[in-house]
């Protein structure tokens, strides 16, 4: 019976092994209680003891002991055992060094930090943030990662390029280094000028002719065409190039003459000259380029040919036809004819001054070349009549449609005697672009979308081809579609994308002339002698208050009450100078009011039309004599009467400036009121359809003005690069690829988008012939000297290293000067000159360069002190305005040489 009870006791103890209570851990101990005795040893874990009834129990009573190593202890009230130590009892939260973390925190390396599955995503001064996927810790906060970038221009206006990550982030995520230039201190100066090199002694007759072609009377184009830094790619790290046509005014005269294409580096040489890479003409000896043709730059290859990225050059010939060149040497010194079309355009399309464009009309990745209402295949140059036109190519001639539709009177894009100046846009936003040529909008395939029939005129047409108008595109109402802008025979037209008038804007608006002297008018009947002022049908004074130039215009006369003035039973007709066709329109927010205006240059005035300038009375700031006119300033352009203009906000103050050159001067007007901010009266031109352009032509992060000039004075003419003498002009894009430039029509590296973003829908655009005001308008570099140390030395020389960096927000090109000075222990000073950087300094980057100090004979050198100042030419001159120019200098500790005792 005792034996059975003993077995029963053992079974009970074993059964108790399922009890997890720390005070009743059922371990086998010494048997007892009578009956047969079974000796069970008590083998307890650290922190336990053997109870009287043979069980292992905690030494701390109701709670487990805290054991670590070979010792165990009991934790005090309010604490718990964690990893062998008694720590504060934080319930379900993490404990860190005696502190309870919040329920949103975890313990990392002894500190409470945000709960984060990836500790690498922790952020904030105290790691209180955990950045989500698609975010990064920047500037102490989590910033969303957006598009990839190399430069700030790759990002949206409210973003900047975080170079360490290579992505765009919101600008507010970091403290941005900025320099905001003072306004009102407008001081342009010529940075450099291009003129051709003299012909070599062994030059051919043609080479001698070409060397004498120094005048320019067309609109230059700018893009990166050369690999200047030798890295094997042509991109935004290289210096842009200027492409233009030059001719010989003295030998050939002014108009529609023979010329050659020049490819010139946009960088200014130290002596104020510019470097010519190449000179181009057609395949045959007589294939001269028209001296007033435009230049279009862009990649003509299909966009799936990833190995072909360098833009090509497109121009038109003097006597019809089109040509394209492609680069065959990385440095731009060699080009070959990619294709030559000797047929289109013909003299039915142009009599001089054709302005080609490049676009992908049908969004197939294969660009087209557009001249007026002619479309050529961009890859081959083939036209609609070529039997070997590739099946996948698009080509057409709007004149063919007119021939098939007698009386259609379809537009080409001419005004006065120059053109065509057409453009391309996706007006209805269906993903396919239209060709806008004068008064006709063509579908991508050459079919007619619509034609506006003119019923009025304000000028005679000075050319032998019909004047159907120059074009631009913008948005002047509340819808999302684009409106067509036409300047034609002294009148402005704005039409909806469907060809109907825009609500609230009349058709047409007359372009007024400017006050000034004019030849005596004649009257019909001839017996009429005026005794009171005469007016036209719109109530404008007739001569001499209204002047035009370039031929006769017959204007019926009215009195001040609007009644016809009669003589001998007939209404009096006043004959006066009458050609005032006016130049290609520029669309921009001239006055900073948030609405787009239109500028154009007539024969006698530059006029800005503002569609808020209406009502009775007219709003303040408007021209009080002419409804719809913001301002007008007299000019001098009776030769072509169709010069162009561009607009840019040089100071970034929200008020744009107008850049314009006529026969006798180059001027910059304030956009809000036409005040002349700068005038260069040494400028001279016979004028065609040319205009100055604004572009970062040398990739220095600042804008410049590129001005063509056919000035025949010995020290003038060619191409002039104007810049601000104080380096205050804000930055812009490095590209202006064609006359009909609208920013979104081309990427900064010269690629032609399949479906470009409609310019007028972009928050900072809605412009035409105006370069972009980029995000980070005031971004600036912050140059620092990071380190100075000795590399090597002996009795004859010291070799020292200087590390300079850019802690700012603006990338800067090579050539930043650092002035270096050595001072000996006895205070003798040696100027080692200014050392240029050899590569780009992007934000956060550094460059190390070496300087060698040759120790003069007899000089005791116990230790040298080297001082370095970055962005210093040694004479106090700086290349850049910085956000902090007080941290540019550094002085080393005495640099000793172990080899010199």
Located regions from the model:
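Bacterial N-terminal signal peptides that target proteins for export
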Residues: 1-7
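Ser/Thr-rich, Pro/Gly/Ala-heavy low-complexity intrinsically disordered linkers and tails
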Residues: 9-56, 61-62, 68, 81-86, ...
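Low-complexity, Pro/Thr/Ser/Gly/Ala-rich linker/spacer regions in secreted
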Residues: 37-39, 90-91, 113-118, 145-146, ...
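Disulfide-braced loops of extracellular cysteine-rich modules
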Residues: 38-49, 65-77, 92-103, 118-134, ...
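Fold-core signature of tandem repeat domains
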Residues: 50, 56, 81, 86, ...
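Extracytoplasmic/lumenal domain signature
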Residues: 147, 152, 163-780
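Extracellular/luminal regions of secreted and cell-surface proteins that mediate adhesion/ECM remodeling
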Residues: 775-901
